[in-house]
Swiss-Prot record:
The modification Diphthamide is found at H604. It comes from the Archaea. This is Elongation factor 2. GTP binds at residues 27-34, 93-97, 147-150. Keywords: Cytoplasm, Elongation factor, GTP-binding, Nucleotide-binding, Protein biosynthesis. SUPFAM superfamilies: EF-G C-terminal domain-like, P-loop containing nucleoside triphosphate hydrolases, Ribosomal protein S5 domain 2-like, Translation proteins.
Length: 737
């Protein structure tokens, strides 16, 4: 099918929302996700049939092609016919490596269905479980593709009966996850049932695949598959691919089981839109109204060397056209759309308009970042905080400092880092004001390594880096007394105490149930019912910062307090960015303002006076409340032959890790463990060495946990020394005179 014709067809079909499907392909790293996408692409006539699988057309960054893993979510629109009717399938390829799971979260928001790819030999790995859980939370309907079935024959030498048993076991495992994480109203209808055709078995590399109904129609049995591979005749595998082509099996399943945007928005909008569901804007989204006010949710920002910043996202209401004025809800900025287009692989094709339910690319929204929402400018006052924030499963926990090898490249490097952090909102770029270092924080070592390679390839920058540093958090374990914080001019006094937040509160804030901009009574009710708070105290929460600390105003009748409250809250946020122990962010602390004396003259109560007063009282409180450091822990999920179990558990224990569970199936042990990120630098090579290269494993961020007391002081000193701070522990007297 010639390519130019496809663009026209795709654009005309996009106008009929019942003919549109938005899907993603999600899987663990290396389970064959991008190869699957390529095979689908080839069938749409967008890359040639011959090179699919080798082309890795969606892995369009050369970093991805060298490493053979997908780093960016790429978008593409495919064309597929079923029973003579044409459909547009918007396909978003998402990364499977844990360091990039922030991108998966952003992609899921714009999907209605997902193809979950599982390697028939490795089965369900950590990442598969995480991403399936995320997709069920976002009400994205899964269909299953069990890939690499050829490995069961070539490597494990299974018979056709044994293969079928293995596949049934995998389906049961997936259904158990849907039972665990699915919402009650969806889980039964979303479960995988082979006889319906919502699971496909095949090999993306060899381009064959079938569902049970398709195999019945075409007269293909598992024994035919076994014969094709055991005969050693390549032609038999090719014959299989022409009889049951994988793209047909998968795309037929997508059209049949993934809902169109009009159907899916009816149940997805109530989940992701937290505003009034009877408002005009919510109704337009629920009904996928092409004539409604424009609402576009942005899941990706890319820097195009020629066009500038390109925002990619899904149109949830209205029709996107150039010249529209939109309001960016998070950035609180008005922007004008200059151009709209659709994706064909890495190439954007211009379009006059992109209607509701589709994935669009737009120029002109330079202030947007992924997770942003653009709405019709007329509705700017009615959408504040109405979209549920995206929840990332991990947070940046590893930092390196970067400097250009050639000092002349400094401004070029600053510009490149800025662009990288726009494209990847899980990459944090900071400047250490005192040392002038440029710090880059990411989700893990691979995440940073790939970012450095992008600096080199896209911007021609050669940089020097420090070894990776783990990011810590400061916290407390007791309640403090009330401390008086004085302003430098002694005219303002604040009376503040601190105490630790309980785990329920931290979880409620981390998962977005409790948000700063919620109604106070609603927040207090949730905290009382789910986190053991006193209702009246919870009503007095006035701020929640990004590291999960809360500020409570427990004062009554203090003169001039309202006029300075904004300044106090800024002071609180600043103090919590760098705690007193090691200048690391503070996490999980409740700060209570009991009383205050405020000077009547505004000239005597500006930020220069109030910031130190807030900070000093909070820091004195922290230092007297059994302060500690929290370190990030990683979950490990390792599969190894039984004979290596002892060696592998020894590696985990040596790295201050602990084994949580070991499950044995046949000769394979599956080890679940937790290990501090700080100890995981050489983990890959040690696991390989201890298992003769036969360990499969996955990692993901688990939680923050207190550093053992035995190494606490030593660690604080090391961090202070690295940051050029005095090598002694701070004392209360340093903050309270």
């Amino acid at each position: 099918m010639p390519r130019y014709k496809t663009v026209e067809q795709v654009l005309s079909l996009m106008k009929d929302v019942t003919r549109v499907r938005n899907i993603g392909i999600i899987a663990h790293v290396d389970h064959g996700k991008t190869t699957t996408s390529d095979t689908l692409l080839a069938a749409s006539g967008i890359i040639s049939q011959k090179v699919a699988g080798e082309a890795l057309a969606l892995d369009y960054l050369s970093v991805e092609q060298q490493r053979g893993i997908t780093v960016k979510a790429a978008n593409i629109s495919l064309y597929h016919e079923i029973d003579g009717k044409g459909y547009v399938i918007n396909l978003i390829d998402t990364p499977g490596h844990v360091d990039f799971s922030g991108r998966v979260t952003r992609s899921l928001r714009v999907l209605d269905g997902s193809i979950v790819v599982i390697d028939a030999v490795e089965g369900i790995m950590t990442q598969t479980e995480t991403v399936l859980r995320q997709s069920l939370e976002e009400r994205v309907r899964p269909i299953l593709f069990i890939n690499k079935v050829d490995r069961l024959i070539k490597e494990l030498k299974l018979s056709s009966q044994e293969i079928q048993k293995r596949l049934i076991d995998l389906i049961i495992e997936v259904n158990n996850l849907i039972e665990t994480y699915g919402e009650p109203e969806f889980k039964d209808q979303w479960k995988i049932k082979p006889e319906l055709g919502n699971v496909v078995f095949g090999s993306a590399k060899d381009k064959w695949g079938f569902s049970v109904p398709m195999a019945g129609k075409r007269g293909v049995k598992f024994s035919d598959v076994v014969n094709a591979y055991t005969s050693g005749d390549k032609a038999k595998i090719e014959e299989l691919a022409s009889k049951v082509p994988i793209h047909e099996a998968l795309l037929d399943a997508v059209i049949k089981f993934v809902p169109n945007p009009r159907d899916s928005q009816k149940y997805r909008i109530p989940k992701i839109w937290k505003g009034d569901l009877d408002s005009e804007i919510a109704k337009a989204m629920i009904n996928a109204d092409p004539n409604g006010p424009i609402v576009m949710m942005i899941n990706d920002m890319k820097v195009d060397p020629h066009a500038g910043l390109v925002a990619t996202g899904r149109v949830f209401s209205g029709t996107l056209r150039a010249g529209e004025e939109v309001w960016l809800v998070n950035a609180k900025r008005q922007q004008r759309i200059l151009q709209v287009s659709l994706y064909m692989g890495a190439i954007r094709e211009l379009a006059e308009e992109i209607p509701v339910g589709n994935i669009a690319a737009a120029l002109g929204m330079d202030a947007a970042r992924s997770g942003e929402t653009g709405v019709d400018i007329r509705f700017k006052d009615s959408v504040l905080g109405s979209f549920e924030k995206l929840h990332y499963i991990s947070e940046p926990v590893v930092t390196i400092s970067v400097e250009p090898r050639n000092p002349k490249d400094l401004t070029k490097m600053i510009d490149a880092l800025r662009k990288l952090s726009i494209e990847d909102s899980n990459l944090v770029v900071k400047i250490n004001e005192e040392t002038g270092e440029y710090l880059l924080s990411g989700m893990g070592f691979l995440h940073l390594e790939v970012s450095l390679q992008l600096l080199k390839e896209n911007y021609g920058l050669d940089v020097v880096t420090t070894p990776p540093i783990v990011v810590y958090r400061e916290s407390i374990r007791n309640k403090s007394q009330v401390f008086e914080g004085k302003s430098p001019n002694k005219h303002n006094k604040l009376y503040i105490s601190v105490e630790p937040l309980n785990n329920q509160t931290i979880d409620l804030i981390a998962n977005g149930t409790i948000k700063e901009d919620m109604d106070n009574k609603e927040m207090a009710k949730i905290l009382r019912d789910q986190a053991e708070w006193d209702y009246d105290e919870a009503k007095k929460i006035v701020a929640i910062d990004e590291n999960i600390n809360v500020f409570i105003d427990a004062t009554s009748g203090v003169q001039h307090l309202r006029e300075i409250m904004d300044t106090l809250l800024q002071g609180f946020r600043l103090a919590m960015k760098e705690g007193p122990l090691a200048f690391e962010p503070v996490r999980g602390v409740k700060v209570v303002l009991h009383d205050a004396v405020v000077h009547e003259d505004p000239a005597h109560r500006g930020p220069a006076q109030l910031y130190p007063a807030v900070r000093n009282a909070i820091f004195a409180g922290i230092l007297t409340s059994k302060p500690t450091l929290l370190e990030p822990l990683q979950k490990l999920d390792i599969r190894i032959p039984m004979e290596y179990l002892g060696n592998v558990t020894a590696v985990i224990t040596r790295k201050r890790g602990k084994v949580i569970n070991v499950v044995q199936t046949g000769n394979v042990a599956r080890v679940y463990a937790e290990i501090p990120v700080g100890e995981s630098f050489e983990l890959a090579s040690e696991l390989r060495a201890s298992s003769a290269g036969r360990a499969f494993w996955g990692t993901e961020f688990s939680r923050w946990a207190p550093v053992p007391d035995s190494i606490l002081v030593d660690l604080i000193m090391k961090i202070r020394e690295r940051k050029g701070k005095p090598k002694q522990l701070p004392k209360v007297e340093d903050f309270i005179s």
